[in-house]
């Protein structure tokens, strides 16, 4: 018997009491998209009339989390060149009542104004260092916060397969378009060379599935000698493909950010252990 778990990601705009109740009853996890401070969120997440959505969605999210009890959720933001001080956004979300927080770097072509580049790395590193101190202060004062990217199991960790191939695209999950087309994940939608089949036609290309199963830390040359390979597990296949043209070629900017996050995650855990 297969066990299916469902997760939903929402931008919060159309949440009603009925939808909140349905999500909380049926979804194993829920991801709430919000970028942090009002001015940060509303710069990138605008409604059709050009106005921001912060005021509308934050109240919906608070209601959902309050009703959800101890079931899994997290608020998920994206930081860009516009908010390289993203530790402030993490703290803003925590102070707004959300104790499960994730922020991810935007992945965009360097020609785009808000894209993150190598020149931004020093500031990004400093923000992660700052978050280590901020989270420690919260815990020292009796508070609780889980910052998604500082969660690491130093005793056992994931199973061997997950250590070798952290990205489950094409094997553990797929993306299905409204037309029934099947892709390894949502970021591959539109890249026809990676269309795995179609539900309506009853087709499925197992060769693509096998290709993604073979994308692991030993198939990626830059991963083989990296100290973080068994925690990063090869990174995002979509980023590797979009920026390097090959799912077996790790995207170096992502690698550098990931290594810094792992360093901070280890430091944060060591601090907790020494208390």
Question: For the regions a protein language model found, what residue spans apply to each?
Answer:
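C-terminal accessory region of radical SAM enzymes
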Residues: 123-156, 186-233
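Radical SAM enzyme core and accessory elements
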Residues: 179, 218-275
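Radical SAM enzyme [4Fe-4S]-AdoMet core and its adjacent flexible, acidic
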Residues: 39-55, 62, 66-169
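Conserved SAM/AdoMet-binding glycine-rich loop
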Residues: 1-38
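Glycine-rich, histidine-containing beta strand-loop boundary motifs that form or position
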Residues: 10, 34-36, 77, 105, ...
């Amino acid at each position: 018997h297969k066990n299916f778990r469902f997760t939903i990601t929402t931008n919060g705009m159309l949440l009603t009491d009925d939808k909140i109740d349905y999500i909380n009853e049926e979804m194993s996890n829920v991801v709430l998209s919000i970028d942090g401070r009002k001015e940060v969120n509303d710069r990138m997440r605008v409604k059709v009339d050009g106005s921001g959505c912060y005021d509308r969605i934050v109240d919906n999210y608070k209601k959902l989390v309050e009703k959800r009890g101890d079931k899994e959720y997290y608020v998920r933001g994206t930081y860009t060149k516009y908010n390289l001080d993203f530790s402030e956004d993490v703290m803003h979300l925590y102070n707004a009542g959300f104790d499960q927080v994730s922020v991810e770097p935007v992945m965009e072509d360097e020609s785009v104004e808000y894209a993150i580049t190598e020149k931004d790395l020093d500031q990004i590193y400093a923000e992660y260092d700052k978050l280590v101190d901020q989270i420690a202060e919260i815990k020292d004062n009796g508070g609780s916060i889980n910052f998604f990217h500082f969660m690491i199991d130093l005793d056992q960790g994931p199973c061997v397969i997950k250590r070798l191939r952290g990205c489950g695209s094409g094997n553990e999950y797929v993306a299905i378009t409204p037309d029934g087309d099947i892709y390894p994940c949502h970021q591959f939608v539109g890249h026809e060379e990676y269309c795995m089949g179609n539900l309506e036609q009853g087709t499925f290309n197992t060769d693509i599935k096998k290709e993604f199963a073979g994308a692991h830390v030993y198939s990626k040359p830059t991963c083989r000698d990296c100290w973080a390979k068994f925690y990063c597990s090869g990174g995002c296949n979509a980023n590797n493909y979009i920026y390097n043209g090959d799912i077996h070629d790790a995207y170096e900017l992502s690698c550098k950010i990931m290594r810094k996050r792992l360093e901070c995650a280890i430091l944060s855990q060591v601090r907790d252990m020494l208390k």
